[in-house]
């Protein structure tokens, strides 16, 4: 069979499933990522290779660029759909998760990597930094709904805002791991540069450029003379341009682009909070995100089925994976929410649903290309196993748990979605 034609056929099926599967799965204890990985496994058994078995150990640059792009698209979407204006008090639950849960998770996972896997300081820190952030791509089912739909309870808000910011805020820890690995030891020579550049400058630049990008793009979209406003086009394609501009502008001045994209999206919302155009931007971005996610997870499933990474899984790797998902994240999340005033059930759900995903692959690929890490194959195997378990366990649990949350709020999860500007046809479905 002609491999090119076969590839087009498979891509056509995947694109069609991108639109149809969320509708088909809306009442089932399954998620779109589970189906994508299963499709990748099935395709790996085919006599031709319609999609690559993208072993990241063999091509870290490809893994880095693909995951980087889908993450920034997801970050823009996450920022656009948060209705709650940023603030110290209104975002208290977010600051707790970022300031307590994430550093605690990094420390505990690094400790597991050092004590159980026998990793050195740099590799253990990299493992913790890569796995601590929750994922904005695979966590769509536990996030808030589209802009101005009223689907923003505290649980969904916490998981959305946390995923939007912690991908960028974990970058300093990745850079610390790179610095230690580059000097072949945990000495203090790197510390001053790390604090001044990787922590202070890059975080400051990320926030500042994100705010500036959001203000400029918001002005062009909503505030220029009416005939020239981007919002008048009604074209959601602009979301992709906003994403690329805010990310690249920040990276050019050596800031953290992940932080900038999310901040830019929040700022854009604040420029004209109730415009229906935010819905158009969000919907287009979500479609692109879903398509890219499906393609990457199909490749992920194909790589798993190929077996070279899973062959490295032993009881140590399995133990670290289980402890990370069952103990580390729930414990860190719960500790961070002590005294927050939330009910125990809410704290439990927020603590458990810290989904790991494509952001972890990005960080590992990026770091692997910057410095030589010992036993990097074991790190990759551990991360892949944790992503697989997280996708399956959280994917099975998310539908009944989110339905319970909506029932507690007195909301029908399957109702049509309404925006302030009018009705959006169709049903709310699991993404």
Residue ranges of each PLM-predicted region?
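Transmembrane helical cores of multi-pass secondary ion antiporters/exchangers
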Residues: 1-431
